Amino acid sequence: MASAFLFACSESDDPSPVVDNSIPEGSVVFDISTVNKLNNGMSRGNVYSQEATQHVTRVSVYAFSNNGSDYVYAKTYDISGWSDGTTFKRYVVAEGDKLPAGDYKFLAVGRDAADQFTVTSPSVGQSYSSMMATIAQSGNESEIFSGTTTAQVLDKGSRVSIEMTRKVAGVLGYFKNVPQILDGKTVTFLRLSASNSNQQVNLTNGVGVNTSPAAYNIIDLNLSGQTVTNGIYTGNNLSAQGVVKVANSQLSGSYFMPVSSVTLTLGLYEANGNAIKTWSVKDTGGVTTFNILANHFYSLGMKVQAGNVNGGTDDPGDDDDPIDLLTDQNIVITISPAWELIHNLIIQ
């Protein structure tokens, strides 16, 4: 049996340790990595800053062999020893679990310990393109990562490197100075609504699949229990989550399935759901219909780090910058893919 050798690091900028790079004859060595580091104490289901973090605790690699017209399922490898904070692992396939030589696609999937995704459990001969992650309803999203590569498995042994990226988007809303009374009406809810939502994502390409088309409130804050000072809500308390905010601010966010051609609406609402004031969200080019993409971060207001209000640096450009709902009429959403990039969106 070929023995497994591996290493794990909890920070993405740690120096690489010295490891044995040899490949046992006839075996396959998987080098698997996630692109984001661990952030201790942050929630896995909620998003409180633009920090790119991860809490992957279980990883599987699916092998799909080339049958001449498609890549079809052959075998699954469950990568042992992956714990919360691991960003790299080397896994050697055991002697009795080798693949025949040939052309393969490999799909690595990384998940949290208690997510609500159902991931396709492929049967022999099933197409590579059929690999999906599904939730029962919008709001059940959390972190899920995947990555894919094509490689030749050789009789003498092969090394396969797979980098996993997030297959959901992140959406954050950071606001301040929400009035209790506006136009003579009591503000009870602060909501960011998407015109459509998906419940499935293709793990091979990050494209969302619409199984139950429906509008969805990505952010839905009930303000009624908050203290009011000088007519302004004092803000939601997230100290138990390790979050530090500016005074009189509202912060909320979540992961969201990729979805195309949606509009976003920010609004203040009465207890009965009637809108008091709404803003249309735009990107920096003035477009109101856009795509929410996997591994991109969409932010109304800016919060670089959850645990402070200065972004962890002396640069004032990293300071918290919540949208002021008393004065701001144009509101920018930043869209970031690093997550990969941060995009600016505007509300009017």
Task: Name what the model sees in each region.
Residues 21, 36-40, 60-62, 69:
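N-terminal extension/subdomain marker
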Residues 113-161, 274-297, 304-307:
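Structured interaction patches on ligand/partner-binding surfaces of diverse proteins
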Residues 50-121, 181-294, 341-348:
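Tryptophan-paired
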Residues 26-28, 32-36, 229, 236, ...:
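Low-complexity, acidic Ser/Thr/Pro-rich "mucin-like" tracts of secreted and single-pass surface proteins
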Residues 33-53, 174-183:
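Structural motif
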Residues 3-33, 173, 295, 300:
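Bacterial Sec-dependent N-terminal signal peptides
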Residues 150-156, 165-169, 174-188:
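Secondary-structure boundary elements
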Residues 27-31, 60, 105-107, 159-161, ...:
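Beta-strand secondary-structure signal
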